[in-house]
Amino acid sequence: MIPVTELRYFADTQPAYRILKPWWDVFTDYISIVMLMIAVFGGTLQVTQDKMICLPCKWVTKDSCNDSFRGWGASSPEPTYPNSTVLPTPDTGPTGIKYDLDRHQYNYVDAVCYENRLHWFAKYFPYLVLLHTLIFLACSNFWFKFPRTSSKLEHFVSILLKCFDSPWTTRALSETVVEESDPKPAFSKMNGSMDKKSSTVSEDVEATVPMLQRTKSRIEQGIVDRSETGVLDKKEGEQAKALFEKVKKFRTHVEEGDIVYRLYMRQTIIKVIKFFLIICYTVYYVHNIKFDVDCTVDIESLTGYRTYRCAHPLATLFKILASFYISLVIFYGLICMYTLWWMLRRSLKKYSFESIREESSYSDIPDVKNDFAFMLHLIDQYDPLYSKRFAVFLSEVSENKLRQLNLNNEWTLDKLRQRLTKNAQDKLELHLFMLSGIPDTVFDLLELEVLKLELIPDVTIPPSIAQLTGLKELWLYHTAAKIEAPALAFLRENLRALHIKFTDIKEIPLWIYSLKTLEELHLTGNLSAENNRYIVIDGLRELKRLKVLRLKSNLSKLPQVVTDVGVHLQKLSINNEGTKLIVLNSLKKMVNLTELELIRCDLERIPHSIFSLHNLQEIDLKDNNLKTIEEIISFQHLHRLTCLKLWYNHIAYIPIQIGNLTNLERLYLNRNKIEKIPTQLFYCRKLRYLDLSHNNLTLLPADIGLLQNLQNLAVTANRIEALPPELFQCRKLRALHLGNNVLQSLPSRVGELTNLTQIELRGNRLECLPVELGECPLLKRSGLVVEEDLFSTLPPEVKERLWRADKEQA
């Protein structure tokens, strides 16, 4: 038989699952153990003890055995003797009962009477108890074994225990009691002035962008509050980060269904039904457990008797055990009914962390549903502290704090200094790409002037940005940045340039329209939708000091607000990504414009409204599908125009009126289809930069020598066969790009270009280089772009001088 100490195995599940067992499951498990003990004890007795003890009955009346024999009287019926083959003599009194049966006959009679005459309930009582108990245990533990539920439960318990023991949980919960209040020393010096400014930041954002007064809350505008976090070591931080990812994936997976809830409900219903079934038939049949049993069997031919009186030795004990078993089943059933009532009364497929949100600083802990909610309800019956500690890993605020700590551990001050570079404007720049946030050490780079944030989700700009007193330029590329009120107050006074690139309107922080001192704004993204234009563009009216506006989008027409801010704009740049831009008459109002860029706007012709902008100094009409530029005659009214860019178009010829642009200093006509250069072009005597590369030119006119101020000439990728001698009269030439033409030779007069620093000759038909290249004192080997075999045709002393010039520069 099974030892009693091993019975617990049938009721115990994995030790880790104990936290999923409410008090009622614990009670029913122990009741099941007692039931098992009853079954094992009864079964053991039944196997080891005599099941039935039978004796033949000599005095039988109507197949019933009389307890004693009395003499026959006149009034007494005459007894019969079916069990005896020899009738007793009436006048001989009995002095005792003697049976002529041996031991084997008695054993046979016991077995036959036990099998045929003992009631089935008394016979199988221990086995019924064992069967019902095993069914109860199976119902209680099936959800721990069924693959579709056990996997979820195992995963849940594993994550829950790790969250409970995580150092991050303890630190996060401790912040709800004690908040760190010591600000950084460098920032504390500015608190006196910054606090006053930040107190009105939220109101100013709403005031400057009227549409926000109705639709945007303080949080939606990206203005948030912040508290300092503790410190974890790197290993603990990485472990906590992994836990956050596991919790996210587990929540997504478990909230999809409610199979755990439904299976637990069905288990409970089955146990309740089983309870009623057991009570009904057990109470009904328990009285059939009797000590005395009359047994009438047709075995007279084997034993000589037909009727026997039998004793069931275990009847009294079985009756006691049955009564005890019934009481246990009643207690078990009441618990199951309470469980069912608990499940039906409460909404167990929803779990709210409302109380935890009120007690802690993590007000963003979400409510959960379905199986996730049900398992948390079960955990609360075991110990509510588990849910409280687990909730920390459901909070995005908590995750952001942890992410910030890990980020600070990874990005030390020395590592950030190694990432500092000088940009084209010679400003000290830091580019952070695809990080989880902004490392706090960034704000210790006091020399920083330009900060680029790209693909950084949910970044929050802290007050410590005020330490960067030299910061004047901020880039937000696909970065939906929030900002704290003190930080916004600082940027309002100090930020001068802002670059924003977005694909979704939500990536544009609305607080940018409160930057009163902003002078330069670059917006790159889709503004074709009407609501996008309204939200993004409309706020520009409040940027009164804006001088430079760059829009890279796909507008169909110039928004009215651009015209409104254009009164004080000095530079307007629109890159329309190939979408046709129409209705440009409003440009006339931008009287203060000095630079205008209309790139990829599919204009086809030069807009007439440009000619009214008398302060224009630079015009860029790149890639606009221009085929003719006859309107260029009107440019003569733009007396301040010094730079004209008509590159990347389909221009076939240059109008002779180009000569009227006498103040022109830079002219870009590259990437067109020009075949001839008019003489009038060389009347622009102030030209310093002329780019005619990638056209269809076959020669350069001799009048090019009139451009005495020319410093850079580019005619790369044409079909020029020879260079006019007059070209070398342009003594100020510093760069000469002649690559990919069909030049047969390079004139020796090239040595007269004493200011030449770069000459490109690659891709021509030259056989040798003139020795006079050595007479260009500023020319170096790196500035001579030519095939290596062609370079080898120069005399050794010339090559040596060119190489030496490179080394001296290095």
Curated annotation (Swiss-Prot):
Sequence positions bearing Phosphoserine: 202, 217
GO cellular component: cell surface; cytoplasm; lysosomal membrane; membrane; monoatomic ion channel complex; plasma membrane
InterPro entries: Leu-rich_rpt (IPR001611), Leu-rich_rpt_typical-subtyp (IPR003591), LRR_dom_sf (IPR032675), LRR_domain-containing (IPR050216), LRR_R13L4/SHOC2-like (IPR055414), LRRC8_Pannexin-like (IPR021040)
Segments on the Cytoplasmic side according to the record's topology features: 1-22, 143-264, 342-810
Known catalytic reactions: chloride(in) = chloride(out); iodide(out) = iodide(in); taurine(out) = taurine(in); L-aspartate(out) = L-aspartate(in)
Keyword vocabulary terms for this entry: Acetylation, Cell membrane, Differentiation, Disulfide bond, Glycoprotein, Ion channel, Ion transport, Leucine-rich repeat, Lysosome, Membrane, Phosphoprotein, Repeat, Spermatogenesis, Transmembrane, Transmembrane helix, Transport
UniProt cross-references to SMART domains, sorted A to Z: LRR_SD22, LRR_TYP
Glycosylation sites: 66, 83
Biological process annotations from GO: aspartate transmembrane transport; cell volume homeostasis; chloride transmembrane transport; cyclic-GMP-AMP transmembrane import across plasma membrane; intracellular glucose homeostasis; intracellular signal transduction; monoatomic anion transmembrane transport; monoatomic anion transport
Main location: membrane
PROSITE patterns, A to Z: LRR
Ranges: LRR repeats: 399-422, 423-445, 447-468, 469-492, 493-515, 518-542, 543-565, 567-589, 590-613, 614-637, 639-661, 662-684, 686-707, 708-730, 732-753, 754-776, 778-801
Short name of one Pfam family: LRR_8
GO molecular function terms listed in the Swiss-Prot or TrEMBL record: cyclic-GMP-AMP transmembrane transporter activity; identical protein binding; volume-sensitive anion channel activity
Stored Gene3D superfamilies: Ribonuclease Inhibitor (3.80.10.10)
Membrane topology classification: Multi-pass membrane protein
Location within or outside the cell: Cell membrane; Lysosome membrane
Stretches that traverse the bilayer: 23-47, 124-142, 265-286, 317-341
Post-translational modification: N-glycosylated.
Domain notes per entry: The volume-regulated anion channel (VRAC) channel forms a trimer of dimers, with symmetry mismatch between the pore-forming domain and the cytosolic LRR repeats, a topology similar to gap junction proteins. The di-leucine motif is required for lysosomal localization.
Function: Essential component of the volume-regulated anion channel (VRAC, also named VSOAC channel), an anion channel required to maintain a constant cell volume in response to extracellular or intracellular osmotic changes. The VRAC channel conducts iodide better than chloride and can also conduct organic osmolytes like taurine. Mediates efflux of amino acids, such as aspartate and glutamate, in response to osmotic stress.
Family: Belongs to the LRRC8 family.
PANTHER family referenced in this protein's UniProt entry, alphabetically: PTHR48051, RAS SUPPRESSOR PROTEIN 1 (PTHR48051:SF1)
Quaternary context: Heterohexamer; oligomerizes with other LRRC8 proteins (LRRC8B, LRRC8C, LRRC8D and/or LRRC8E) to form a heterohexamer. Can form homohexamers in vitro, but these have lower conductance than heterohexamers. Detected in a channel complex that contains LRRC8A, LRRC8C and LRRC8E. In vivo, the subunit composition may depend primarily on expression levels, and heterooligomeric channels containing various proportions of the different LRRC8 proteins may coexist. Interact with GRB2. Interacts with NOX4; this interaction prevents the ubiquitin-mediated degradation of LRRC8A.
Record-given protein name: Volume-regulated anion channel subunit LRRC8A
Native source organism of the sequence: Rattus norvegicus
